[in-house]
């Protein structure tokens, strides 16, 4: 049995035993000021304002290690027991009315909402990874103009307007947009100003219903544009982009999961209109497609 197969079997065993979110773990260029995806978050290398949350480290499991730099809001993330018919624990992230990016907290005095953490692969960086998790927006969730959801990352230039140059970073978070439309929001060497929109509207999130989202990121061979991103929702492929450039050096690899979720956008026009929340569960990382039955309303 291969090492990859052993890892996948171990993850399946942990999840089946109720160990919560057991985890290891159309294209448009970026916008100018004031556009939807503008994304000025806390600097990646800034010290965390709170210590690493032990309750979340336990939730994510031994294969993902919460880094002490670049985190915020972890003290507000609650771990919830498995509900009837679901069989997994979840975490709840709250978005207070008026909250948006961390810049809006510092600049506009807005309430802080959402949460962010860098979850490093304990067994080291990779070049071809599947990340799967479940997300559920509360019943009646008001998507407003949009917000961020977790994805994969490598390096330091992954958010906040730090456009990567092929040697220092990339990321592939998701966004929800108006009406619940989904997309990949990627920081790439080809991005301008901020991130790059991929696949806007190729799927939609439905409030009150769990969705299983899975992305596969395969890094390019340095010197070639042969990387790719594929997205599945509830087991169905909804987006694929080949011929991608993530890096120009083999030293840049996929380091972990960028757990990042908040409303925004860089100003209060992106703020959450009401107090609301989203739930996340079953974070799994593998070197192959991750089978996960749709959860629906459980």
Where are the regions that the model predicts?
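N-terminal secretory signal peptides and thylakoid transit peptides that target proteins
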Residues: 1-16
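Low-complexity, Ser/Thr/Pro/Gly-rich disordered linker/stalk regions
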Residues: 18, 27-211, 215-298
């Amino acid at each position: 049995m291969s090492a990859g197969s052993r890892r996948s079997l171990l993850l399946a065993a942990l999840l089946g035993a109720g160990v919560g979110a057991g985890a290891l773990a159309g294209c448009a260029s970026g916008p100018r000021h004031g556009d939807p995806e503008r994304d000025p978050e806390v600097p990646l290398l800034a010290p965390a304002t709170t210590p690493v949350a032990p309750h979340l480290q336990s939730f994510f499991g031994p294969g993902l290690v919460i880094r002490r730099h670049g985190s915020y809001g972890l003290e507000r993330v609650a771990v919830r027991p498995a509900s009837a018919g679901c069989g997994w624990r979840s975490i709840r992230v709250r978005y207070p009315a008026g909250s948006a990016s961390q810049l809006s907290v510092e600049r506009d005095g807005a309430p802080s909402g959402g949460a962010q953490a860098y979850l490093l692969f304990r067994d080291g960086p990779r070049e071809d990874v599947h990340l799967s998790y479940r997300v559920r927006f509360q019943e009646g969730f008001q998507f407003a103009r949009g917000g961020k959801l977790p994805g994969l990352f490598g390096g330091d230039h992954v958010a906040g307007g730090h456009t990567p140059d092929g040697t220092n970073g990339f990321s592939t978070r998701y966004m929800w947009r108006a009406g619940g439309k989904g997309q990949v929001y990627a920081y790439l060497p080809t991005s301008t100003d901020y991130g790059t929109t991929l696949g806007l509207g190729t799927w939609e999130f439905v409030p009150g219903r769990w969705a299983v989202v899975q992305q596969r990121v395969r890094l390019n061979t340095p010197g070639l544009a042969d990387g790719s991103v594929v997205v599945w929702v509830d087991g169905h492929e909804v987006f694929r982009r080949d011929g991608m450039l993530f890096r120009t050096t083999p030293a840049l690899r996929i380091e972990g999961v960028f757990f990042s979720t908040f409303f925004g956008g860089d100003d209060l026009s992106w703020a959450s209109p009401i107090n609301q929340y989203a739930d996340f569960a079953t974070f799994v990382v593998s070197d192959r497609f991750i089978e996960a039955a749709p959860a629906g309303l459980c």
